[in-house]
């Protein structure tokens, strides 16, 4: 089984949290709402990976004014690729508290939508199990 270290930002701006809706046909949680993030590449430092993933998935215009390591966790997930292949992966999640200075987002094709959500409205979204766990641990659900 392949192992991946995943950097995952919990991004907050003006009291709201950023959720991204995964594409329907791929990823670990197709069609569900999630936090952004992705894998650390060989030789890459953790914060470099976090900033790269944010640029790739959310665009160059989003400005983070604060990044603080928060927690970690692990689990085993099935990843679905765009061609329909599936793979079981041992995932190690490194989760960061992030504050953005703006809300200027340009999502890539991994996502179909995004939303800035008030804490009291987070439970109304079809959150994947990993995001639900993270938000509950943070006291937001």
Swiss-Prot record:
A motif (Nudix box) lies at residues 38-59. It catalyses: a ribonucleoside 5'-triphosphate + H2O = a ribonucleoside 5'-phosphate + diphosphate + H(+); a 2'-deoxyribonucleoside 5'-triphosphate + H2O = a 2'-deoxyribonucleoside 5'-phosphate + diphosphate + H(+); dUTP + H2O = dUMP + diphosphate + H(+); dTTP + H2O = dTMP + diphosphate + H(+). GO terms for cellular component: cytoplasm. Gene3D superfamilies: Nucleoside Triphosphate Pyrophosphohydrolase. It is an enzyme of class 3 (hydrolase). Its EC number is 3.6.1.9, 3.6.1.12, 3.6.1.-, 3.6.1.23. Residues 1-141 form the Nudix hydrolase domain. Belongs to the Nudix hydrolase family. NudI subfamily. Catalyzes the hydrolysis of nucleoside triphosphates, with a preference for pyrimidine deoxynucleoside triphosphates (dUTP, dTTP and dCTP). Monomer. This is Nucleoside triphosphatase NudI. It comes from Salmonella typhimurium (strain LT2 / SGSC1412 / ATCC 700720). The gene is nudI.
